[in-house]
Structure formats: C-alpha cells, structure tokens
Amino acid sequence: MHDIKWIREEPEALVRALVRRQVAKDEAVALRDKLLSLDTARRETLTKLEGLLARRNAASKEIGQAKAAKDEARAAALMDEVAKLKVDVPELEQSAKAIEGELDGLLAAIPNVPLESVPEGKDEHDNVELKVVGTKRNYAFTPKQHFELGEALGLMDFETASKLSGARFVVNKGPLARLERALGQFFLDMHVEQHGYTEVNPPLLVRDETMYGTAQLPKFFDDQFAVYAGSTQRAIGDETDAERYWLIPTAEVPLTNLVRDSILSEDELPLRFTANTPCFRAEAGSAGRDTRGMIRQHQFTKVEMVSITTPETSEEEHHRMLACAEAVLQKLDLHYRVVTLCTGDMGFASRKTFDIEVWLPGQNAYREISSCSVCGDFQARRMNARYRPAEGKGPRFVHTLNGSGVAVGRALVAVLETYQQEDGSIVVPDVLQSYMGGVTVIAKA
C-alpha cells in the first residue's frame, strides 16, 4: 500500500510507475487525479470537522457562562447551536469515513512501484535471464513427463484424486509420497541449519486482515479458498464476519504477518522465518493451462522463506534469499536458470522479483520452481509493521521479502524427470537417501 503523502508530493512518479507496470497512461492519469481529488476532499472534510468539534466545545462552555450571567436569550441561542452541531458533526464524520474508505480502497488496489533496475516489459517473454546453472542431461531415450512416470509406477493417482476432490488434485503413494516428504524436510533442514532461518509451524486458516496485510486481498479475492464456520457468507470487509477464514495460498501470508501491528527494535533485524505448509489456490485465471500433472494444482506443498529487514539491508537480503533457494537445487544437482521478472510479469506486491526456473527434461522446458521478491514497505504499511532505528529516531516501516525455498511439488516433478531411467525407475538423489531410509531407486513393485 502506498503513502498518500508520496502521491500528493510526487504525483507524476505514480503515473510513471503505473505505466511501467503496463497500465495505460490515460488510466494512470485518471487514477492519479481521482486519488488527489479524494485526498483533497478528505483533508477539507477533516478540517471542517475539527472546526465544528472545536465550536461545539466552545459553545458548550459559553452556555454555562451565559447562564451564570443570567443571559437566558444567549444561552438559548447557544443551546440551539449545540443541538445543530450534534446533528452536523455525525453527518460530517460519516462523510469523512466514506471518503477515507474510498481512498483506502483505491490505494489498496495499486501495485507496488518497480525498482529502476527492473526490466520493462509486458509479460514473461520480456524477462531477463541472469544466469544458467548446471547443464542439461543427455538421455539415451526420450525422457517422459512426471505424470507418465508416476502413473506407470502405480504411485501417482489423478483419477482417484478427481473422485475425491475434482480436477487439479493428486494422490501420491508409497515411496513417491515419502520422496515428496523427504524433499520438504531436506529443504527445511538446509534453511534452518545452514541458512539461519527460524522454523515456524503457522496456521493454515487466516482472517481477512491477515490476507490484506500481504496484499492477497482484495486484489486476488477470486483466486482464494474461503472456509465458513457458519452458514452465512458475508461480504469481504464486513466487520461482523468473525466466522470466515481463508486457506493460505502461501506460507508468506502467516509468516509475514507475524510482525503485524508491532514495533521492533533494529537490533532484532533481520528476522528470518521458514515453513513447510500445504498451500491452496483456486487458479481462477489458469483455465486450460497445465491441466495434466502436478505443475498447477489447487493444493500443493511449498517451503517458504520470509525476511523482515531495514530499508538499508533489503537489497542485500534479497540476493541472500535467492542464494538460499539456489543452494537446495544445487544440492539436488538440478539444472536451472535465474531470471529477473519484467515490470509486466512481476507480482502485485513486489518491487523486484527473481525467478528460478528448473529444467524439466520430460517437458523439454524451464518451469518456475521459486520466486524471490523484495516488497519494500508495501506490505509493512498494510500491516503497520515498524521498527525503531538504533539512532533513536521515530519508528520506520520495515521491509519485507519472501521467496519459495522451494516449491516441493515442483521439486518432486523435477527429480522424477531428471533422475528417470529408461525402465521408468527413479534414482533417489544422494542427499535424499538418508530421508528415504536408504532407498536408492524407486521402481515398480
């Protein structure tokens, strides 16, 4: 969320940022003008309200003075004035609240401002490759896709999952289920033991304000799963809605909100959290995409990393987080590349994002397995998350970062396709064998 003071002082900076975000210039200008108009109306209304409140207080005192002076006519006139003010003040308060709500709604719908170092572009085709790590393996046979391998092994069952839950679900069984669990545990162990993250086991159900804090709401309302404890489904933002929860789309949501409504001391920073959780997404805009296999599912497992830093250290932390995500792929000896997302492809809350794309031999394509984003104070403003600088100045907003470390389901896909053998069996990567009870190969029973 943006500071209206910044927009008031640098309105053209907002327009430039939105245009870089691939918003049409006339739309950006119209939005700027609407924001400034609402801001002016809000400030004028508040000024008028302050004047009425001051006059009401003064008139109340003057009534006592008039009565003491036995000036009944003046006392009566003042009482009439106070009575009118008691009507006018609530009306003006309602007006101020309505303007504030409209302004906040517009501000909440504006994406983060991209850093100048972010390449400009419309979509994924304009992303910039930073580096390629490892080499593509050569196979003496045509590599199969993960779902072909899993189904042939009798360990990956989409048909039964569809009976249970519908499309975009899977049932993994036996050693394949254990391999998926091993991947998540391996990632967690690396991040905790080698990368300095604190493991957290967060709730999977969160409230409106938690989703708002990380900017999943209101922007991505249609891509979420809501859970209702009662039968009444109320509108988003309804303050009486104490029975609705949201299934987390990523552990970024609860982990980042751990610092909501708090003032930290600078010596506590950086804070680094990690969690391995199920994640739930409606995939509302993905009709027809990746309909087979585990690439795009309604429920998947992901290890998440979240960092809370000062503004001065967030860029360095961003590169550190990327290195942590890369490290787990290097340990698995998976070929991948790193790209910088362009302005038209980066996430709503991000000011800069690095994607790691792992090579899938069966698909003959790179696919995203991690996104590492720095959000600046965009989420912190929504959460009111601040810290007190060491030099004793007033509280400042923290910077937040998040990254996949990495997506467990997609890592399973990558391991299956990379480590497949001609007979359809899967070699278990060396670093995972201790998590697999010494199993070295997964083959059909």
Swiss-Prot record:
Task: Give disulfide pairs as residue numbers.
Answer: none
* GO molecular-function terms, A-Z: ATP binding; serine-tRNA ligase activity
Give the UniProt subcellular location, in the record's own words: Cytoplasm
Give the binding site residues for L-serine: T250, A251, E252, E304, S404
Which of this chain's residues are annotated to bind ATP? Answer: R281, A282, E283, E368, I369, S370, S371
Keyword terms, alphabetized = Aminoacyl-tRNA synthetase, ATP-binding, Cytoplasm, Ligase, Nucleotide-binding, Protein biosynthesis
- Cellular component terms (Gene Ontology): cytoplasm
Give the enzyme's EC designation. Answer: 6.1.1.11
Show the catalytic activity.
tRNA(Ser) + L-serine + ATP = L-seryl-tRNA(Ser) + AMP + diphosphate + H(+); tRNA(Sec) + L-serine + ATP = L-seryl-tRNA(Sec) + AMP + diphosphate + H(+)
* Pathway noted in the entry: Aminoacyl-tRNA biosynthesis; selenocysteinyl-tRNA(Sec) biosynthesis; L-seryl-tRNA(Sec) from L-serine and tRNA(Sec): step 1/1
Q: Which InterPro entries match?
A: aa-tRNA-synt_IIb, aa-tRNA-synth_II, aa-tRNA-synth_II/BPL/LPL, Ser-tRNA-ligase_type_1, Ser-tRNA-synth_1_N, SerRS_1_N_sf, SerRS_core, tRNA-bd_arm
Biological process (GO), any one? selenocysteine biosynthetic process
Any Pfam family from its record, for instance, is: tRNA-synt_2b
Query: Could you say which enzyme class this protein belongs to?
Result: ligase
Q: Its function? A: Catalyzes the attachment of serine to tRNA(Ser). Is also able to aminoacylate tRNA(Sec) with serine, to form the misacylated tRNA L-seryl-tRNA(Sec), which will be further converted into selenocysteinyl-tRNA(Sec).
Q: What is known of its domains?
A: Consists of two distinct domains, a catalytic core and a N-terminal extension that is involved in tRNA binding.
The record's annotation in PANTHER family points to:
SERINE--TRNA LIGASE (PTHR43697:SF1), SERYL-TRNA SYNTHETASE (PTHR43697)
- Family according to the record: Belongs to the class-II aminoacyl-tRNA synthetase family. Type-1 seryl-tRNA synthetase subfamily.
Give the protein name, as stated in the record: Serine--tRNA ligase
Q: Which organism is it from?
A: Azorhizobium caulinodans (strain ATCC 43989 / DSM 5975 / JCM 20966 / LMG 6465 / NBRC 14845 / NCIMB 13405 / ORS 571)
Gene this protein is translated from:
serS
